[in-house]
Design a protein with these regions (language model features):
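Phosphate/nucleotide-binding beta-alpha loop and adjacent structural elements of enzyme active sites
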Residues: 1-214
Length: 214
């Protein structure tokens, strides 16, 4: 769980996805028993099936997509994206897991999968109609081959009435704005159409994400 959510952890049920069994086992004890949190041993994608995960020199740069040396050339961070190994993993669509009763419908989504965010969010399908907020890593330049960029996320989420509210720069590219955290919430102009159950959840995410007054 992100540090900013920890003060509110008693109001959050975290559903984490980790395709590596050893890493999933490490994560489970970090979820308090009372939270009903889950660690699901799957990757997420637009199409279910077997995928190759490119393990990068720096684990945080690992991706289902191959990095693009041409785009990364000239940045000191470039060597961290170099692939050092590859492993096969199974990926599923989130909406299929939900249909099978294995995960609850999401209220808020946090996705940071190194260039594969668009495909993961597509796999939520019509469940996005019930989502009140999304925090996604997003990109202005294609650091990974074939990746979608921020404007693609905006276009994907607009039909679900999820609108871009804020971006914050992700450091690492020596002053260039290459990667950001993008925050989307339901409704235009900060005036979402919410159910009574959603209203306190929306108020909480506004506070945690620092969107009050924006």
């Amino acid at each position: 769980m992100q540090q900013k959510w920890k003060p509110h952890r008693r109001r959050v049920r975290a559903i984490l996805f980790e395709p590596n069994p050893a890493e999933a086992a490490r994560l489970r004890p970090t979820l308090p028993a009372w939270s009903e949190g889950l660690v699901v041993e799957h990757g997420l994608a637009e199409v279910a099936g077997a995928y190759t995960l490119n393990l990068a020199h720096w684990p945080g740069c690992t991706s289902l997509l191959a990095s693009d040396p041409g785009v990364l050339a000239g940045y000191k961070i470039a060597p961290l994206y170099e692939t050092v190994d590859r492993v096969n993993i199974e990926c599923v669509r989130f909406d299929e897991l939900h249909k099978a009763g294995k995960v609850p419908a999401p209220d808020v989504i946090k996705v940071d999968v190194e260039g594969y965010e668009h495909q993961v969010l597509t796999g939520f399908g019509d469940l996005l109609h019930g989502v009140i907020g999304i925090e996604a890593e997003a990109w202005f330049y294609p650091v990974f081959k074939g990746q979608k960029l921020l404007h693609d996320l905006v276009a994907l989420l607009a039909p679900f009435s999820l609108h871009l509210r804020r971006i914050e720069a992700v450091p690492g590219f020596e002053g260039d704005l290459v990667c950001v955290n993008a925050y989307f919430t339901r409704g235009k102009a900060g005036h979402p159409d919410l159910t009574l159950e959603q209203q306190p959840k929306y108020a909480l995410l506004q506070r945690v994400w620092g969107l009050n007054g924006i």
